[in-house]
Amino acid sequence: IKSGAIVDCTLGYGGHSGAILEQNQNVNLIACDQDEEAIKFSTERLKKFGQRAQIFKSKFSEILGKVEQGQIRGILADIGVSSLQLDKNERGFGLKSENLDMRMDVQARFSAYDVVNSYSARELERIFEGYGELPNPAKFAAKIIEARQNGEIKSAERLAQIIGLKGVNGRSVSAATLAFQAIRIEVNNELGELQNLLQSIEDSQIDECVVAIISFHSLEDRIVKNKFRQWAQSCICPPQALKCTCGGNNALGKIVSKKAVTPSTAEIKANPRSSCAKMRIFKISRGKNAR
C-alpha cells in the first residue's frame, strides 16, 4: 500500500500503527481503541507523525462510520487482549489478578464480576460451551454456583482456583484459562464486534482495499474464514438452483491467503503469546462486481 489511509481497528499500545507509519511514508493512519489508557499511551507514541495519525475512542465495529472512506486502502484488526492488558493485575484479565473486571472499555458498566456473580448455571454453561469450548461446561458452572453460596467471588485469582488450573482433555491449557476466555468474550461481546466489523466493511463503499484480520482462537478464525469465503463467491444462487440467475458477478474481491498466515519459529520465540495467532487476508476489488 503506497498511498491513501490504513485503518488500525485495534490500536492498543501502537505497535502496529507505529510500524505502518514508519514503513509507509505516504500513508495516513486511522486508528481506534476502547481502552483510554492505551489511547493516551499511543497518542504520545505516535505524536511524532503529526497529522498523519488520527486516533478515535471507538469500538472497531463502528469506526468506518466515523471517517471518510474514500481513501481507505487497508484495514487491520488484531483481535483479542494485548499483552499489557493481560499483565496488568488491576484489569482483571489474568489468572492471578486481584479483581474481576475484563472490560476493554473501563467506562462500560458490565464486567466479569457481573457475569460470575449474577449469571445462572444455564447462562454460565452457555458461554463456557460456546465461547470457551470447555468440555462438560455444566460441571464448571456448578462449581461457580456452589462457591457463590459462601459469598461473592471478587478476584480473578479466586475464580481460577474455583474452576481449576489443571489441563482439560489432555491439553496443556487449563480449564480456568478457557473459562476466562469465555467470560472475557461475553463481557466485551468480542465475537459480535468482529461480525459487526466484517459486516460494516461489506456494507461500505470501500474499494481496492486489503483487509487483514489477526485472530487468536478458533471461534474468531472461523468467523473470518467463513466471511472471506462468502465475499469471494461470484455466484450467490441457492445450492438447489438449476442454473445461475444472480449474474455471477457478486464477488467482493478475492482471498489473498488461501491458508491462514501463522508466525514463524523466530516470532514465537520472541513473543510466545503469538503461537496461536492466525492472519487471514482479503483484497477488496469491487469493480464491475460491486454489489
Question: Could you say what each language-model-derived stretch is?
Answer:
Residues 1-291:
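S-adenosyl-L-methionine-dependent methyltransferase catalytic core, i.e., the SAM/SAH-binding region
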